[in-house]
Every structure is written in C-alpha cells, then in structure tokens.
Amino acid sequence: MSNRGNLNLNLPPSSGKYTVGENVHFELSKEKNNSTNSNPHTSSTSTSNSNNTGIGVAKSLSTNDNNNDNDNQQPQQHEQIQSKAKSQSQSQSQSQSQPQTQVQVEQQQQQQSLVNSPAAQLAAKKRKKKKSKKSSNNNGNNSNTNSNSNSEITNTSISMPHAFLNNPDEDYPTSRVIKQAPNGDVIVESLDHVGGTYEDHLHDDYSDEDTLHHHLRQAPHQASNNNHIHNHSHTSSHPLQHTPNHLHHASHNANPLTQHISASGASMRSHGHNDAHSNLWDSASLEEQEKLKEFWESLEESQKLDLVKIDKQSIMKMFKNETRQHLQQLLQNGVLNNQNASSSNNCACKYCGRRNNIIEEELENIYDNHFDDIIDFIHEVRDINDLNALPGLLFGGFHMLEEERRLQKRKQLHNEHLELAKSSNLQNQAHIEEIRAQMDKLKMNQRQQSQSQSQSQSQQQRDVQTAQSQVLSKDSSLKNANTSMNKQHTSQQLLQPQIQAQGKNNLQQNHHTHHHHQQPLQHPTVQISATFLSSNPTETQLFNKLLDPKLFEALESLDLQKMKEVSHFDPQNTAHINMLEKAGSLREIVRDLHNVDRNHLEKGMSYVQNMGKLFSNIASLNPSNPEDAEKIMTGQLNEQFNQGLSTFAEDLLKNDGSSFISMMETLSELRSAREELLKEKTPYNGLLTKTPAATSQDREQQVQPNHSHWLDEDDHDHEHEHEHEHEHEHEIDDEDHEHYCCHHHQHHHLHGDEEYDEEDEEDDEEYEYGDDEEEEDEEDEEEGEDEELEEVVEDDVDEEILDDEEEFDAKNASDTESEISEEEKMQEIRRLFLIQVIKLFQERLKSAYKEKVSKDNTRKLFEELEAEEAAKREKEAKKLKQKEKAKERKRLQQLAKEEEKRKKEEEAKRIAEELHAKQEQLKLEQKKKKEEARLRREEEKKKKLEEIKRREAEHKRKVEEQIKHDEEQRRLKEERRKELEEKKRQKEEEKKQKELLKKQKEEEKERLRIEREKQLEKEAAVSKSIPQPSPKSKHVMKLAATFQSDIPSKQNQAQNGNQSHLPPQSRLRQDEENPQKTFANSVFSAKEYNSIYQPLPGSLSNNSSSAALSVGTQLSNFQALSHPQQQQQQYSNDIYLPSANLATATVQSPRSAPINLPNGTSAVGVSLANHLSLNNSSQGSPWTTNSTLSSNLGSTGLSHGQGQTVSGVNTNLPSSIGITSGGASQIFQPQPQPQLQPHQPQQQQQQQQQQQQQQQQNYFSPFNSFSEPLVGEPFQGIVHPTTNINNSTTASSSTGAIIPPMNPSGNIWNSNIGATATNAPASVSRNNSVWSNNAITPKPSEPSFLSTAGRSSSLWGTLANAPVASSSNNNSNATANYDNNNVRSLGSSSFAPANPGQHELEVIQTAIYNCFQMMQNSNQLEFNVAPLMAIFSNVRSLTNKTQLTVNQFLNCCVSNSLYQFDFVYDDFGTVTHLKVGLNGLNDHNSVNGFSKSSTTPPLLPISAMNSKILGYTQQQQQQQQPQPQPQSQQQYPLQHSHQQRLLQLFSNNQTILSQDVTSSAFATGTNTQGSSYGQVQLGAVSPAFARTSPPGLFPNDIPLLSTINELNSTPSTGTGTGTGSGVGAGTGAVFGSGIWN
C-alpha cells in the first residue's frame, strides 16, 4: 500500500488523528528536499484515487536522517490542522476537482517517539554540551561550535506543512480517521474502532524502540569482541544511549575485516532506526508481533522456504546497503566534514569510505571459503529450517540466540561446578588450612598492610559517601540483606589485601590495569566462593532458578546505612526516610518485584542490579583484620548466607506489594530537581587523578570473586580483555561490561548525584514505556546504563586527561588485538553473518507482511467506500420504499383477505380429507379384525385336528401294546406248555438212559478189571525208572498215594475218543438219539464232595426261602464216562439222593451266605462254565444258602475200590449247602462206602441216574436271567480226543477233558449259545435276561447238559457235571513223564486239571475280589458297591479272558468259605452292582485231620495273579489272545495253553524261583497187595506262591501250591481191590479232593 521511507510526519500531541471529512492536502517546504536524493529509502508517495471518493492528501516529505540520530535536534513543533468540511467546501468551492489520492504516510518510530519526550530534550542538551566542548578543543572556539550545531538543527528541521482541500465540492465521509501506525504505515480506521490517542501510540513506540535498540546494540557488541579500531567521534543512534566515551581503541593498523566487523555493528546501531527493517521489528507492539507470527503461520510451505532462503547475493547486498546508508547518514550529519581537518585521508575505517571495496571482497571470500562453517553455526544456534520456530528467531534476533546458548552453557558449567565442588570438598578443606597458615603470616605484616589498606579504604569511603548522597529514596528493605551479603562478599576477599598491595603501584603508574594480570593471584578466592556455594547445593539450585546471580550480587552490594548518612544532599528525600526505615528486610522489594508483570519485573531487577553496582560497600569489613578473616574462614557466615538465599527465594515467590513501584514513581518526579543539583555540585573532579586506580582495583577485586562461580563461557573468554577509554566516541562494548571496570566506579564515586539522576531517569523511562519484547538481557541494560553514566561524567573531564587516556587506550588496544586468536575471529565472523542472515529474514518477512497489510488496508478502504455508496443508494431506496408502502399496504390487505379465504377453503378441504381418511381407516381396521378372527378359527381347527390325531395315535399305541402284551402272555403260556412237554420227554429219555446205564455198568465192570491189571503191570515197570525224590517230595507223595482215585476204564476213553472224532452233525444226532449217554459223558464224579464236607445235624438254615432235601440226601457225584457200563460202575457205590425231594421248585430270593473254605488262595483252572450253573436248581438261589457243613472225613469209610476219581479233577464240593424243604432241616449224612470195587450195585446206579434227571429237569431262575447253564456259553465243555498208549484202566487215558471253547464273537451281551460243541448239550434260553442271550432252546428230545435233573440243588452240585479230564501227556519233560497212560504230567497236574471249571472259578473269584479292592482303594465305588460293568471289564482284562460274558461272570460270583458276593438289583430284577468281601475262617474246624486257619490269606498282587499264577509272561499273554480258529482247533485251546504254561513254570531246574518246595505234578499209584501209594516230586515254585497257605494247615510246611495242585487233584492210579496202606489208608479217597475248591 505504501513504500517505507525515512520521513518524519509528527502529528500534534493534542490530536493523534486526522478527520477524513477535512479534505486536506499537505505540502512541505523545499528546504531539505535536495537531500532526499541521497537516501535510497526516501520516498514521496501518492496513491491512485478510488471512485472519486476518499482521501486526497498528498504529502511531499523530506527525509531527515539527522532526526534518526536525535543527538543535535530540538523537538519538532507541529501544527494541528483542524477545519470542518463545510467551511472548507464553502471557501474553496470554485477550485477544480483534483484526483482524489490516499497519502501513504511513512515514518520511523524512533523519530515519532522522541518529539515530545522530556528525556529526549535532556539528552539533546547533554550531547550538545559535550560536542561543544570537543569542538572548542579542536577549534578553540566554543561559540562557533554552538553556532554550527544550531545551524545543523536549523538546516535539518522540517518546515510547517500547509494544508488545503483538493476537492472542496466533494462530500467526504466523516466516519473514518487517518492515523499513523507504529511501523510508519497509514491506517484508515473507523471511528468506532479507534483506540487510544497519539500520546499512547507515541508512548508504546518509544518504549518499543528503546528496548529494541538495546538488543540491536548488544548484538554487534558481542560480535565486536573488543577488537574494533575507531579513531573518530561518531555519534550513537540510540535516543537514550548517549554516545559513550569509554569505548575501546585499537591501532589503525588492524586488518580491514576487523574494522568492518566493528563498523558493521556500529552501523547497525546508528542506522537501526532508519533501516527499512528496524521499525517493524524494533518498535512492533506485542499485538503486531502476534500478527506477524500469524502471518508467518498463514504462509504456505513454499513461501516460507522462499523467505528463509540464504544466498550470497542477498547477504552481500545487505552489507553494501548498510555501508552506503551509514555513509549517507554521516554525510548528512556533517561528521565527515568535521573530521576532515584532523584525519584527512589517513583513516582506514569503513566510515571514511576508502576501503569499502576491500572489505566487501574480504567478506565475499569469507562467505565463499567458510560458507559451510557459517551455515553450521547458524543451525547450531537455531535450526532455521524449522519454519515453525522462525518467528522466535526473527523477533529474538541474534541477541536471543546467544542468550539461549549462554544459558545452556551456564547451566552446564553450573552442574560441572557442583560436581567439582562435591569432589573437591576435601581439597578445599586443605586449602582452607593453607589459607589459615597464610593468615598467620599476614598477621606478621599486619601493620604494613593495614596502613596501605586504610589509605585506599578511606579514599573509597569518601567517594562512596559522595556518590551515595542521592540514593535516599532507595528501598531500605535491602539493609538487612546487605549486612549478610556484604559479609559473604567480603568473605571472598580474604586474600585481596595482598593482591591490592601488589597491584597498587601498577595502578598508580598506569591508571588502568588488565584483569588478567591479577588472575593467577585470585584462584584461592575462587575456591572459597565455590566452597560457600557448594556447601548448600539445594539452596544454591533454588537461588539459581529464581534469580539471576548478577541481581543477587547487586543486592548484596548495597549499604543503605551510608546512603542515609548522605541524605542531606537532597533535602527533598528526607520525606522518604521513614519509608526506608520501615522496610526492615528484603521482603518489600521482593514483593514488589513479584507483583509486577514480566517486563516490569525485568526492569526492576535491572534497576536494583545497577543500584548495587553504584553503591556497593567495600569497606564494611576489613579482610586484613585477623579476627574478621578468621570469623569468615571458620564458616560463621555460612548460616547467614544460606538464610539470605532462602529468604530472597521465599519472598520472591510468596509476597506481593507496591512499595517498589510507588518508589520508582516518586523518584521519577524528582529527577529535575536532582539534575540541577548535579550541575551545581562538581567539586569532585580533582579526585579523578588521585585515586582512580585504587578505586577501580578495589571494585574489580570486590566483583571478580563474586562472579567466579557464575561466569558463562563468553565471560571466561573475555573477562580479562575489557579496557575502557574515555576519548573515542564509538560504542564497541561486549557482553561482559557488567564486570564494572575502573572508570565506572571512579565516575560513580565522583558524580554520584548526576549518575543517579541519569540512572533513575533511565529506569523510570524504562518503567514508564515498558519493554514489550519477550525476553531482555540484563547484561545489556547494565552496559547501556554504564555507558550513559560514563557519557555524563565525560562532559566534566579535563582535556588533558582525555588525551592521556587516548594514548594509553591505543596502547592497550593494540595489546588486546594481538591476543585475539583466529578462532575468535572466525567466531565473530560467524556472528556477523548470523546477524546479516537474521536481518535478511526480517527484511523479507517484513516486506511480505507490509505487502499483505497494504493490500488489506486498500481492501478495507474500498470496502468502506463501497459501504458509503451503498448507504447513499439506501437513502434513495428509502424514499422509494416509503412511496411504495401505501401501495404495499393495500396490496397486503388484499392479499390478507385472499389468504384468509384460501385458508378457510383449505381448512374445509382438510376436514373433509380427514373425515374420509378416518372412514378408510375404520374400514381397514374392521377388515383386519375379520381376518384375524378367521385366522384364529383356522388355528383352533388345526389344534383340534392335531389333538384328535394325537389321541388316535395314543389309542393306537395302547392297542398295539395290549396286543403285544397278549402275544407275550400267549408266548409265555406256550413256553410253559413246551417246558412241561420237554420235562415229560426228558423223563422218558431218562428212563431209557437208565436202562442203557445198567448195561454200560455191567460192561464197564469187566473192562475196568482188565484195565486195572494192565495198569498195575505198567506202573510197576514205570516206578522202577522213576528217580528218587527228595524227602519233602516223598512225604507229599505218600500223602497223595492215600488219596488216589479210581482209574476210568479204557472202554470209556476209547468210546469218548471215537465220539470226539465224529463230525458235528453225527455227534448232534447221537446226542439227540442217546441224550443219557451224552449227559453221562459231560458230568464228572463228585464222590469226593461226600467224603469231606457233609452237613451236621441242625446246620441247615430254617429260612423259608431255601428248598430242603429229605434226610439222608447227599450230594451226588457225577463221573463222565464213555460207556454206560463205566458210568454204572462209577455210580454203583455213590450215595443216593431221593429224587422226589428234587421235584419241588420254590422261588427264592438271592441271598449271600458265608461258606467257609479254608483255602487261602485258589489255583487257576481254565474251564469253568460247563461245570457251574448257579441258578438252575429249584431249591433256591445258591448264594442264599445259610447252612454249614461239618467235615466228617474220618467216617467216610470209602473202600479201596470205591475211591475212583479222574486225574487232575477236583470233584469235591467244599462249600456247605443246606437244602430244606417245607421248613424242615435236612442233614446230609455221608454213607459209609466200602472199598472201591470193580462193580457197583445196580440200585445205586439207578438212584444216581434219577437224581441226575431231576437235576436236569428242575430249572429255576429268580429273575429269569441265570436259568441257562454255562455249558451253553463260550466256556461250554468240549471233549477232546486223546490217544491211549496202552489199554490200562486209567480214566485219564480213556476220557477227554471238557475244555470250554471261546466265544468267537467276543460279545458279552449277545453270546451265541448255538455255537457250542456237539458233546455239549444245549441250554435253556433266557427269555427275560437284560442281556438277551440268543440261546437255542433245546429240543424236547435233547437232555440239557447241565439241567437240574442230574444235579444236586446245592451250589457245588453244579460241579458234578464236570467231565473226566484227559491226562493225555504231551509233556516233553522226560523226568516227569513216566507213563503217558497212568501218570499225570506237569502240564495237567497244576493248572490243567481234569476238572478245569473249578480251577477257573477260583481264578475269576480271586480276580473279582482284587478288582473290588482296587476300585475301593481308588474311590471308584458307589456307596461301597462296585458297578457291575466296571468290575466285569476289569476282571476280564485282568484274567485275559476276552470272551468271558456277563452271564458267565455272574455265575462265577458264588459265595464260598473265602469270598462273599452280594448283588444289587434294579426294579426289573437285573443285577447292577456287586459287592465282594472275605469270609472269616473257623479255627475249630478241621478237614482231613488238618486244622483250618482263621487267618485271611494274603491277597496276591495283580501282576502275580495275572502272570505268576497263570504262568503267563507278557509275550505269552499277547500270544494267548483269542484268534479266530477252525472248529477243530478251537475245541481244546485252553487245555493246551495251560499245559504250556505249567511246563514253563514248573519244569525241572528251569523255573526254580525259590527253595520253598511246592508240589509238582507226579502222583503214581500201585495196586500191589491191595495197597495204594502216591509219589510226588517236588519242584520249584514262584515266590508269589511260596508259603501262601494258612499256617498250620499242612504238616511240614507244605506250600499252598502243592495243596492246590497236588492235594486238590485226584491221582491217576490207585484203584484196586486191596486195602489201602499209608497215610489215609482205609479211606480209599484222595487227599485233597476238592477241599480247596
């Protein structure tokens, strides 16, 4: 919108705005217009008109760069132009209309802010006085200098502008004002949004300018680094910063680069107020800065990158423009003209303009060679590519960047010092001891040192008293803190007296000294300061966070007591004494500092700091005094030091107040009076030449230790290189001016009043026009204030002193420059380029922002003008509207009527529609209800139909069930009828069989006689070849010889052998034709049962649930014979049981009864099922018998010829069974049997046959589940054919053993009974069994193999059906095989007896008991009973009998003397659970002379039972798994397997596992002279069987195995007609015939 220029349009103070309604045109006089050509920034601007309306203000302004300097100008007087639009339009109504233009007024903020400032006037006076003195020294005429100054002021002043209207006839809007922005732009604002007055803007501009120039001045100070070479009096551009006269000087021989660096910094300071970029950045308010930041953020990425692009051309252009602008400024100010006489063309600085090209070339070379280094440095300071952080870089400038780095380094150094302090505590203690030793030495020279010190102290006191006369208004709250802090300060000066004494002569000679000359002597003080600071690290850290150390230094340097003493110099300050005394502590000033905002807080802190620099008390304590030094060294001040730190930090955070602010306001009102007092009191000038060195040295010694801990990196680099001179007027200061060089303190003491006035003026102005910058460096403020004070003092300095200082300063400057390293030069170069880069960025952003602001202002102006035009058009429209209102009213009334009519019509129409809709809705609802009713009726109809169907189905089901029930009843009746027919048929067959038996017995008698003779001969021959047995073996054989059984006839064996080789059809046909013969072959002799266990009188149960036999009824003995004669011979001497008592069948409930069997364990047989039927007897359930039997073996009276048994078969009945009928107890009394004879009486045979028939016919099953015999199960006996070597009458050689075949299907639930062998008769089917056995109902002509007709009603009577076992000897053992026909081999002696059913029963019962115990131990029982299927599966897997069925398993669960089995039935009578227990043994009972032990036999381990007892190994068990075999091979698998196991277990010297002997399998007998004997060869036995018999049961500790295997089997020989000899002679029966079975 406008171009920036160096123009000065100062509006009147009373009115800071123009009223736009006054069409004003400004024209300035042409006095200074010729100078504008030299300034490239001078502009005379005019803007185009806009729509013939707006502002027609044209300004032709002359740029006056002398106003930028503000050193030689008086305040500009401005004319306030106010006239009304109407009067101007009337007075100039005939003027031509000129194009309306908008004047873009541009002005520097500095010039605007200094117009009416009293401070500016005072500064101008002081500078004029200084210049007049200098010009008088140069020219000798003060009046000429003053006239020249006045002429300069006159020449550079701006003429009063004349205003006139461009277009008086035009109607200009009066709603806007034109005013000037702080950046020089013309702002057109609405009256509603105008805020503030001109004075307010001037106030803000002044304060902003003041603050910014501190920053712009500080940056080149840092860059200069005391290396600048200036020999000319160039004025400073800072309005309040008077030209300092204590600048550093260097020789003119310095290189051009150094000169340019110095000049560049000075140029930036002097020209900073009229540079294009300075106003925007230096004087921008916070609001405008925020706008600039928002503008930056609104830019796009590409635009931001364009703004921050760094190129060589732009940077070099910045250097050149800066140089040219500075030269033009100097020309305008007449500086070069004044210096031509003295310097001519010998000056080498850039201000003379002679070496500009060389400097520019040098800069270009530096840029080319060190571009990367410079860019790295810029990035190190702040990443300029971080576009978001760039506004902070632009506003903060180089000074802020350096401050950030300084703070970081300061923190780093502080942390390092803390660590060093901690690590060096012990070393410090040692140093303190050394210092104490030095203090002792100092006592020796105390007088000499005290004299020299007293002189310097007295001089200092006088100077301090003089300088402190004007500080009575200072806050007395610093008094108490000053006491402790002065002690702390003095504690750091213990070694200074010696340093002062050494440096005094040098100071008096040279008047100045360098700090680095005394650095080696000050390190003990540094260590002491570090010790004090590190002794309390917590307080030190808090202090470092809350307050800058330099401010703390200033606070501790105050001595307000002495300020009060000199208060009489200013009588006006006496009114403030009471306020000073009331403060009492540091709280007041801390509260004031805490209560103000940030900028004012920084001002106040700087104020207090400068106060401390001026009025620090040096002589409060005497460091040379031994008492004071000892007090300090012993740490007594440490507590006060820490207390001061804590108090200051606490008050800074907590307290508040306004005393500090009110104090500063009061001081600002008294500046004028004190200024006059300063001018009058100047008698202290003479002191300058007396003690400046001493005062300076004392100040340096007092300040230097205090900063030893807080110096940053730059301070350490340059703290010893500051030398201040008083002649040169260039301002080249660096950041370390706060170290209070000697001239500062000298002038402070001499001119305290004047300095205080200047300082108060400075501070008050800073407070009044506060700084709006984000941060402010206190060091820079100190520097500026020091320079101002030095300027004031410089006016009173004699010319001779200035000359001397010039010469001395030149020497020191050359020395200083020689010490600058190349690295420092490169650092300054980097800083210089960084400054230029920042300025470049600022210029670009400023230009872009100004362009945007200009466009926005233009747009706003056009918008306002358009709004005004719219207002005019609106006025005209109003008139038209008013005219049209009447018409509109009429039209509206008409429309209202029409609308009302239309509404009525619509309402009627709407009502009709609603009525119609309601009717439609009602119809729909009625239709819906009808539909719902129809659906409900259909649904109910469906439900009724479904109910009818359901009832019909239920009725049909009931009818079917009734039909099924009727059919079942008919079937049951038919079955009963068939049963009766079958019984009848069986009776008939039995009659026929009896007749056949009679014939067979007769033939058998003859055959047996022949066989005995042959057998005796053969045995006599074999006995000769038998080796002599051991003593135990002989004893057992003797016992066994007495119990030899009769030998079956050879005829029976041959007949059975012939029958076994017949095909199944032929054998079945034979069985049907001759059932009596088949039955005779399937049973075995059970005479042994009558010889041991016979019921005693009264032992039968009186329970009504048992069926009884008549008195004298005894258990039948069945012998499976091959011929009827053999069978008749067998049964000729048996005990007869009345068959009439067997016909009665009563339903009995199952009940367990204890059956005492003295056997501790059981020998395992193979075949069980074909010899055991548990519930076929009509006399009741076998396990409910409660009767006991008493052994009456001695009264048996069996003859020698009647003890006929089958080899290896246990035919005795060990359990006691009581059979009652009608509640009467019957006693089974053993009949005296004569010796075995070849023939038996015919009557006895008939009676035995009748008993067998009755047992076969009497079927009974309480639950119709066990009515079938086990013969029909897979264990049904099969007669195996055997070969007979000789024709002896051995039963074992002539008969085949019944071996139960395995169930090939393996189905325990559905065992096919029809797959039995031919010789095994069919069994009755179980109709109501839960397992539904598919049994084949036998034909009426077929006798049941285990029917109740031929059995006893007792449990053990079922064993009478066991056939005669074959003693066919397939044994390969030569020592045991004596005679294949007469002697039992090992294979059939123990585990393959002729009666395998009993043997198998014991195995299964033992396994059942062990499984029950296992389940009980593992908590698998259910209410102390085991589930049937669980224990059944365990027993089957344990015994390796995979084809064992549930029916067979239940038949084996028979209670005996050893085990007791209890069943649990369900509602249908099916067994669901089983309980197994042990029965107790009676000690008073004895069997065959052996007492039965009551000790429960130990249970064998399962592994022993499974492998040891059965003789299995795991490999053999796997081999013994049932395999599908042909029928011819399945007939005798178990017998063969038993023989193999016995061969492996009991073969000679092959399976000897223990020395405990057990009976082997050898039993022989002879019939010599009517005597029988038995020989038993003992063999080794498994440890599992060793000594397992009950104690005392057998003599000579015969093991249980021999009892089971030997004594329990019937010898194969021993039948004859003679009288038996040996043990058991006269009994004619065997020793162990079934006592364990």
UniProtKB/Swiss-Prot annotation:
InterPro entries registered for this protein in UniProt: NST1
Pfam family, one: NST1
Chief location bin: cytoplasm
Subcellular locations according to the entry: Cytoplasm
Region named Disordered: 1-155, 221-252, 442-494, 504-523, 681-734, 746-825, 871-1036, 1049-1075, 1176-1299, 1512-1534
Compositionally biased tracts (Basic and acidic residues): 24-33, 717-734, 871-887, 896-1021
Keywords tagged on the record: Coiled coil, Cytoplasm, Stress response
Biased composition (Acidic residues): 754-808
GO CC, alphabetical: cytoplasm
Keyword Coiled coil among record annotations: yes
Compositionally biased region (Polar residues): 1-17, 471-487, 692-706, 1049-1063, 1201-1228, 1258-1267
Coiled coil start-end: 855-1023
Biased composition (Low complexity): 34-53, 64-113, 135-155, 446-470, 1176-1199, 1234-1257, 1282-1299, 1514-1534
Bias kind Basic residues: ranges: 124-134
Similarity section: Belongs to the NST1 family.
Chain's role: May act as a negative regulator of salt tolerance.
Protein name per the record: Stress response protein NST1
